[in-house]
Amino acid sequence: MIVPCIDLMDGKVVQLVQGRKKALEGDTPLEMLRKFGEFPEIQVIDLDAAMGHGENSALVEMLTVKARCRVGGGVRTADRARRLVDLGAHRVIVGTAAFTPALEEISKAVGAERVLVALDSKDGKIVVKGWREATDLTAVDVLHKLEPYCSGFLCTYVDKEGMLQGTDLEWFRQLREATNHEITAAGGITTMEDIRALTAMGIHSALGMAIYTGRLDLAELARLNVYYPPSVS
C-alpha cells in the first residue's frame, strides 16, 4: 500500500528535511486531499502539535471527515487519542508516548487496532521528542514488546528523511523479520525500485518529498493500490 503524507505546520502543508528545516510548501490541505483521494489511506501529521507549538485541529478534522486518515502529532495521552478518533481519524500514530505508560492507556482508550506506533531511527537508535533526543534502543529491540498495544508500526529511517537519497532496505528487512505486524516504511523512499523492494517484503510505503517534488508520479503510484479502496468515497 502507498500512503501519501500531509504534514501540517502553521495551517499549511509542508515538507521538512530531517524533521527540522522546511524545504517546501504544498498546495492547500484540501487540494492535497483531492490529489490523494485515490489512495486507500492518507497520513496526516500535525507538526505543530508534535513540537508543542499549538495544533491544527480544524484542518485535521476537515481532512479526517473527508477521507480515511491515520493521524499523528502530539499523541501523548489517551484523551488526545480519543479526541483524534472523535474528529474522524481512522488510526492514531503514537511516537514518544510509546515508551511511556501512556501507550497502554491509549491502546485501551481507542483499541489497539486503531494505534500505529512510530519508531524513528537515526544512527541506528530510536529517537524521540521530535527526533531531538536519542535513546539507547534499536527498533528491533522493542518491536515485540510493543505489539500488544498496536496494529502496526510506522518506521522512519530518519538519516535520509526528506533528502531524496534512497532508504536503507536492509534495515527494513530486519524489521520485517522481527514482527508479523503491519509495517509502513518512511524516510528517503525516492524511486519505484525502493517501493517495489519494500512491497516485496510486505511493507507499505509512506511518501512525502518524492511526491511533492514530482520525483514519483501520483497516477503510477495510485495504480499500485489497485486492491485497496480509495480513501475518499
Model-derived segments and their meaning:
Residues E41-E55, T96, C155-L164:
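Glycine-rich, proline-tolerant flexible connector loops at the mouths of alpha/beta enzymes
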Residues E25, G54-E61, R132-D141, Q165-Q174:
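Charged helix-capping and loop-helix junction motifs
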Residues A58-V60, V65-V92, E170-S205:
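Catalytic cores of alpha/beta
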Residues K35-G37, V85-D86, L146-E147, T199:
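Non-catalytic positions within long, well-ordered alpha-helices that form the structural scaffold/packing
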Residues G19-F36:
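Short catalytic helix/loop segments, enriched in acidic residues and glycine
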Residues L8-K22, A89-E161:
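Conserved anion-binding
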Residues P101-V110, V115-V117, I195, T199-S233:
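C-terminal helical cap(s) of enzyme catalytic domains, especially alpha/beta-barrels
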Residues M1-C5, E41-V44, R68-R70, H90-I93, ...:
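Structural preference for beta-strand elements that scaffold enzyme active sites
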